């Protein structure tokens, strides 16, 4: 939030950023002082229920749907416009329900898939919309980098002062059939978003495989050891589109490449 969300709100002359909420009291206070925000708090529900707020920006860490979905739901129920980071929810049906709720209340919603606004991507979109490329039949995309190549880099990027015993752990079950989503959601989503816009169609059928190439790593920054974490750090999928086109996607954050290393070919 301190590198993207908050600076963006502060720079905009279309709004007033009035309150920052974080479960870490010291961090909430520090960010408010850093960006000149008049208020800070640690109670998200109380803040969302305030009648003087129009927009809620949900940019919390979300491993198992423990924050994005409930905070977004509450904000919409309270009549707030919502910007939320991915994933909105762990079940796509809940996303559709929240979309319907927002529309029923005349509320604006946005998922933080911002790579689509890069000048190069916008130029690609313009070419497609103007018909200069022709009928889009095939999309190939990948997003890969080496952010988690080093197993000493913690699976959870948050900086903890003490061990977070209250958190549900990712990837505790070593069974390959129980692998938990990581790269596909975190790094695939922005490129999938770009691909769907370019191919101008919806996915009909797909087959996907996820792999755990670096099986042991540190879980938290406070750990002094590595452990088995069954977590998707590389994946591939191919799909049929409803109008007959084909769509392929590959992501990984344990490969040597640029950051963020996005490739989109239509």
Features from the language model and the residues they span:
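Predominantly a Rossmann-like dinucleotide-binding segment in NAD(P)-dependent oxidoreductases
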Residues: 1, 118-228
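Short, conserved SAM-binding/catalytic segment
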Residues: 31-37, 97, 101-102
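Beta-strand-loop-alpha-helix segment that lines the small-molecule cofactor/substrate pocket
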Residues: 55, 63-117, 131
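NAD(P)-dinucleotide binding in Rossmann-like oxidoreductases
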Residues: 227-234, 242-266
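Conserved SAM-binding strand-loop segment of SAM-dependent methyltransferases
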Residues: 37-44
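N-terminal Rossmann-like dinucleotide-binding module
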Residues: 1-35
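Short glycine-/small-residue-rich Rossmann-like dinucleotide-binding loops
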Residues: 52, 59-64, 251
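Short, Asp-centered acidic motifs that coordinate Mg2+ and/or phosphate
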Residues: 19, 39, 55, 138
């Amino acid at each position: 939030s301190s590198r993207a969300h908050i600076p963006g709100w502060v720079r905009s002359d279309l709004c007033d950023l009035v309150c920052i909420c974080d479960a870490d009291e010291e961090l909430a206070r520090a960010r408010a002082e850093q960006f000149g925000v008049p208020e800070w708090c640690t109670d998200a529900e109380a803040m969302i229920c305030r009648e003087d707020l129009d927009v809620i920006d949900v940019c919390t860490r979300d491993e198992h749907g423990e924050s994005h979905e409930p905070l977004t739901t509450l904000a919409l129920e309270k009549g707030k416009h919502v910007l939320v980071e991915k994933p909105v929810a762990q079940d796509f049906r809940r996303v559709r329900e929240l979309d319907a709720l927002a529309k029923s209340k005349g509320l604006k919603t946005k998922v933080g898939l911002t790579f689509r606004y890069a000048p190069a991507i916008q130029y690609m979109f313009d070419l497609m919309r103007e018909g200069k490329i022709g009928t889009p039949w095939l999309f190939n995309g990948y997003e890969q980098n080496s952010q988690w190549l080093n197993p000493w880099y913690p699976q959870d990027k948050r900086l903890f002062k003490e061990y977070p015993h209250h958190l549900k752990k990712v990837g505790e079950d070593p069974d390959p059939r129980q692998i938990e989503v990581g790269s596909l959601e975190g790094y695939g989503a922005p490129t999938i978003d770009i691909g769907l816009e370019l191919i101008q169609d919806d996915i009909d059928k797909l087959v996907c495989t996820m792999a755990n190439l670096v099986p042991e790593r540190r879980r938290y920054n406070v750990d002094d050891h590595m452990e088995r974490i069954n977590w998707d750090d590389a994946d591939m999928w191919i799909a049929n589109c409803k109008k007959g086109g084909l769509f392929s996607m590959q992501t990984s954050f344990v490969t040597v490449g640029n950051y963020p290393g996005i490739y989109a070919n239509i």
